[in-house]
Structures are given as structure tokens and as C-alpha cells.
Amino acid sequence: MAFENLKISRHISSSTKNLLKAKKIMAALASNPQMLTRQAHGNKKEQLWRKESLNLEKKCGFCVSVYSNEKLGRSHMEKEWRLKAFWSNIAQPTTLEMEPINNVEELDAVLSHARQLSQPIIIEWMASWCRKCIYLKPKLEKLAAEYNNRAKFYYVDVNKVPQTLVKRGNISKMPTIQLWKEDEMKEEVIGGHKGWLVIEEVRELINKFV
């Protein structure tokens, strides 16, 4: 019986403490009604930020993260938008325009820069009257985007450059796609067959040297 009375006494004591805490909180809110206003305002702003995040994600295809941070007990909300590409083709280009090489000096400069980066370069030797050359150029520019920062792509129009440059490449047929590395021509593909086969051969060529 004494044990049961003790349990009841403890329960009443605990309830009394909770009631006193509740009264203190109510008294604090009554004396400072701005606390409720700030909390409600903060919740409303949080909902607005999240709504705008969803709208932006639907429209732009971006992942949007909203971060809330309260420091040192202050009711201060810090918002930070962080946009990340949802599709890989947003982050990387789908095509890279090939740059022309106009003379031997430019070729030497290109090779020197590639040597410093320890990267190969691809050169399409072409002519404006060569239909196959014109057909391959945009496909090679797509391949250039695929190997961006690993290999650099160039072209030489043999009708617009000195013959010393053409002889440097030892060109006899067009289109000819060559891979150069460490100041030397390593391998080449003669593009007389189907375009997709040429591109695959060039890709295999690059993979051997990157």
C-alpha cells in the first residue's frame, strides 16, 4: 500500500512539473507574441522556398537543394541554392568545333602544347571539294566533345595551306585522319569507307594513346 502511494505521489509530482512548464511557456508567449509570428513567418518562407525549388526543377531539369541553418540560437535563416546538372549533356558540350592549322609553324605550336599536356591531337586532312571530308567533319566534332580535355581535334584544308605543311603530313588521299603525339604521327585512318566505321576506327585509335 505504501509503495502504491509512493507511485501515485511521484506521478502527481511529475504532472505538476509538466503543468508548471506549460504555464511558463504560455506566459513567455503571452509576454512576447512575436515569437509565434516569427515561427509562423519562418515556416511560410520555408514552404515558399520549397515550392519555388520544385517549380525550377520542373522547368529547367535541375536538382535544387534548399538548406536552412540556424546559428547561435538566432532566428536567422540562411538559404543557399545549389544547382546541379540533371542530365550529363547539360554539363558537357555535345560538339566541339575543330580548329584550323594553317602552316607548319602552327602545327609545331600545337604539337608543343599537346606534348606539355601529354595528350594526342587528331588532324583531319581535308579539302573543300571533298564531299566525304565535309560529311565527316561534324561527326569528328561530336567525337571531339566526347574526348574533351583528353585529346584536341584540328583540321587542315590542303588547298588553303602551304605544300610544306601537306608534305609534313605525307598526305596522298583524303580524307585522312591522323593521330599525332610527342611530335610524331603515330597512326592514321583513310576515310574512304562508311562514315560511322571511320569514326569508330578513330575512336579506337584515340583509346590507344589517351
From Swiss-Prot:
Residues 81-210 form the Thioredoxin domain. It is found in: Plastid, Chloroplast stroma. InterPro entries: Thioredoxin-like_sf (IPR036249), Thioredoxin_domain (IPR013766), WCRKC1/2 (IPR044253). Pfam families: Thioredoxin (PF00085). Coiled coil: none annotated. GO terms for cellular component: chloroplast stroma. Its main location: plastid. The active site is at C130, C133. Keywords: Chloroplast, Disulfide bond, Electron transport, Plastid, Redox-active center, Transit peptide, Transport. Disulfide bonds join C130-C133. Belongs to the thioredoxin family. Probable thiol-disulfide oxidoreductase that may participate in various redox reactions. This is Thioredoxin-like 3-1, chloroplastic. It comes from Arabidopsis thaliana. The gene is WCRKC1.
